[in-house]
Amino acid sequence: MAEVSFGIELLPDDKPTKIAHLIKVAEDNGFEYAWICDHYNNYSYMGVLTLAAVITSKIKLGPGITNPYTRHPLITASNIATLDWISGGRAIIGMGPGDKATFDKMGLPFPCKIPIWNPEAEDEVGPATAIREVKEVIYQYLEGGPVEYEGKYVKTGTADVNARSIQGSDIPFYMGAQGPIMLKTAGEIADGVLVNASNPKDFEVAVPKIEEGAKEAGRSLDEIDVAAYTCFSIDKDEDKAIEATKIVVAFIVMGSPDVVLERHGIDTEKAEQIAEAIGKGDFGTAIGLVDEDMIEAFSIAGDPDTVVDKIEELLKAGVTQVVVGSPIGPDKEKAIELVGQEVIPHFKE
């Protein structure tokens, strides 16, 4: 059986103490990674992860995911160094291009091609280059500085560094990637790739692109942790698990390009109807339009036996980490415990 680790993704939209508690529950149930979303409208990932670091001892902790635009890379580096120190060397970094819904509210274009951290630049810069440069700045910082960088997207002065992390430049860097350029770049520069997908068909497309980038950088695919950032829902009652996932699946359908919908045989007209309903705030109609094909394509949902079967198919497609993402289950804490009791042990035998 292929080796696999388990992570959990949590949206910090509830009390920080509650989210930190769920991370502790995840650690107690065999999860190895905790990823916290980074959006302006929720609690700070840094605050939540700091709380979690104090009450946990093994689970790795990091933003899942942040972006190169809404926070200066030196500030991100300081946050990560601080988290690594507080957690005793358990920090990880997840970084991607951001998301349209958040950027619209912040007045940023998506995809963002503005060289925000280099005011002298005149040319547009794509997300892959932005992430590559921001990573280089962050790791200069984590090596102890001083940081001095001039690229297409980022330009700094000579920045001295007082903060010291425990892992230094060995802190793992994960890149959120979907399209071919981002996947290939992740294969070149990242320790892991966070792919927003729950179905083997998507990894049959993604993994070769990751491997292509790895080979060009003189690396092996075996060096890269391929993480399925899933829409996940588990309950002993399979119908309840599926029902809980429908609103999340509706949003995934709305945001999926036609090429992805066609890959899974999804009716594009129905997808447009879902997008229209969500746009009007009519979530009941959107949920009602979610069908079995959409659930199958965009989620891992069901009872423990069903979930195990679906994860086994992901492993065959090259996945090495399964991230249990929203909604997790009808009851988050019970779902985390159920994964720990009846899913993770199956893959650790």
UniProtKB/Swiss-Prot annotation:
Location(s), subcellular: Cytoplasm
Reactions it catalyzes: 5-methyl-5,6,7,8-tetrahydromethanopterin + oxidized coenzyme F420-(gamma-L-Glu)(n) + H(+) = 5,10-methylenetetrahydromethanopterin + reduced coenzyme F420-(gamma-L-Glu)(n)
Principal localisation: cytoplasm
GO molecular function, one term: coenzyme F420-dependent N5,N10-methenyltetrahydromethanopterin reductase activity
Keyword Cell cycle included in the entry's annotation: no
GO annotation (BP), single: methanogenesis, from carbon dioxide
Gene Ontology CC: one annotated term: cytoplasm
A Pfam family hit: Bac_luciferase
Activation/inhibition comment: Requires the presence of relatively high concentrations of either sulfate or phosphate for maximal activity.
Alphabetical keyword list: Cytoplasm, Methanogenesis, One-carbon metabolism, Oxidoreductase
Catalytic EC class: oxidoreductase
Biological or metabolic pathway of the protein: One-carbon metabolism; methanogenesis from CO(2); methyl-coenzyme M from 5,10-methylene-5,6,7,8-tetrahydromethanopterin: step 1/2
EC numbers for this chain: 1.5.98.2
InterPro entries: F420-G6PD/mer, Luciferase-like_dom, Luciferase-like_sf, MeH4methanopterin_reductase
Subunit structure: Homotetramer composed of two loosely associated dimers.
Family named by the database record: Belongs to the mer family.
Protein task: Catalyzes the reversible reduction of methylene-H(4)MPT to methyl-H(4)MPT.
PANTHER family given in the database record: 5,10-METHYLENETETRAHYDROMETHANOPTERIN REDUCTASE (PTHR43244:SF1), PTHR43244
Protein name as it appears in the record: 5,10-methylenetetrahydromethanopterin reductase
